[in-house]
Swiss-Prot record:
Source taxon at top rank: Bacteria
Keyword Ribonucleoprotein in record: yes
Name recorded for this polypeptide: Small ribosomal subunit protein uS12
InterPro entries, sorted: NA-bd_OB-fold, Ribosomal_uS12, Ribosomal_uS12_bac
A single BP term in Gene Ontology: translation
Presence of the UniProt keyword Ribonucleoprotein in the record: yes
Length: 123
């Protein structure tokens, strides 16, 4: 345990809080270009083919992000907007692609929770 004079001279070092979405660099969203669009399988108790994309961001980071909703139109070189938010059963996927912006079209025929999937109101 340090003495009072040692603390006066040096002080205590602050603990660094680990960021959950470091590639965003404090921004709410970031734009990027898809370098690879593919499906992957989730962790142990679950079973599915989850749609994910590898995205090169404007700040140089390359991240894996989840494509939410049923069906998508994304392919290599599609420009997308990503937000933070991990997918619990996909290790290493810490970002979501925002549907209905840039090249990612909204989910077709969606009636409820439309704002999360970029779906326009059915008229």
């Amino acid at each position: 345990m340090p003495t009072i004079s040692q603390l006066v001279r040096r002080g205590r070092e602050r603990l660094q809080v680990k960021k959950k979405a470091p590639a965003l660099k404090e921004s709410p969203q970031k734009r990027g270009v898809c370098t690879r669009v593919y499906t992957t399988t989730p962790k142990k108790p679950n079973s599915a083919l989850r749609k994910v994309a590898r995205v090169r961001l404007t700040n140089g980071f390359e991240v894996t992000s989840y494509i939410p909703g049923v069906g998508h139109n994304l392919q290599e070189h599609s420009v997308v907007l990503i937000r933070g938010g991990r997918v619990k059963d996909l290790p290493g996927v810490r970002y979501h692609i925002i549907r209905g912006t840039l090249d990612a079209v909204g989910v077709q025929g969606r009636k409820q929770g439309r704002s999360k999937y970029g779906a326009k109101r059915a008229s």
